[in-house]
Amino acid sequence: MIERILAIIVPVFGVIAVGYGYARLRGERVRSEAGALNVLNLNLLGPLLCFTALAAKDFEIAQRAPLLAGAAIVIAVSGLLAWPIARLAGFDARTFVPPMMFNNCGNMGLPLAVLAFGPAALGPAVAMFVLSNTLHFSLGVRIVAHGQVPWRHSLRLLANPMMIGTAIGLAFAVARPPFPQPLFDALKLLGDACIPMMLFALGIRMVDVTARDWRIGVIGAIVCPVVGLAGAFVADALLALDATGRGQLFLFAALPPAVLNFMLAEVYRQEPEKVASITLVGNLAAVASVPAGLALGLAS
């Protein structure tokens, strides 16, 4: 079991380490490069990854309904448990709760799912990523920007390239229209490039980790996988998941906070320095939390 877990996580954290090392060597110049990389991922490669994963012939959306319901339960339970913890610790819930709910199921979760459960796991992992992003851009924004913006503003955030690529992919998954295979393969090649590039970009972001606001960062790094795994146990008790689905759900639940939490905190000026600490310390602590989730998931 230990060897299998190491075989899964070492390549992922290896690419993150390469990104971190590259950022250290490049210095301040790396920020503009990372910005261009993120724009490329968000506007082209990420949408193509979502489209090709969902439109693939072996992806059946109806079969993934229990897994998606499980992911929604994990997100909901995480928020419900994190809220009183934030109050007890003296944190602003708008700062602390969203990073506990919305995890790094994109640039860390996708490659981990493929390495742990094989290429067939990419479609379900993308579906959970899409669900999490949709809730993040709607419910998550409402929590962070409580009282600042109307509902229609947060709904407009859903009209981004990632969501558009997802919508087209879902339409293909339902209707199954004819599509030239060579063209699909070309789009898939581009989409697959998104995964290592997201890991590399995450490594670049790690250079911003500092000791500032360490208390909320450390507490968040502990609470995030704990409440997530609690949600996974609740979902597992309520839903009829197969072995692979159960494994993917526990992996999803153990992931650290998404980097998107920091971006939204900056946009809405909701203590972004504290959210940055939660996000970055949490991703560093994933070296411990992800193997725990994998062990629980692979045990099935």
Q: Where are each of the predicted segments found?
A:
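Alpha-helical transmembrane segments of multi-pass small-molecule/ion transporters
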Residues: 1-300
